[in-house]
Amino acid sequence: MHALVVRVTIHNVDRTRELLDSQVVPGASGAPGFKTGYWTWSTGGGEKNGLSMIIFDSEENARAVGDRIRAIAADTPDDVTLDGVEVREVVASA
């Protein structure tokens, strides 16, 4: 299994939640190899910082969704800044 880890800075909370609900979560959960996913945020320095971890059955499937998330973020620069996207091998779970 592989995890897609995404870090963002959120500028527009309402619009970001709308994007999560309408595009990001449905797109990830409907993607080939999807296992589970968690999207989180916290407030730090006046802006919200988001972190998600989405688990897939393979590195290839995780990378494909990472590419889609990059495209969504590129279309919404006023709402969210993509700070990082990486794929990691899952080495343990509970």
Segments from the language model and where they lie:
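Conserved hydrophobic residues forming the short capping helix/wall of the S-adenosyl-L-methionine
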Residues: 73
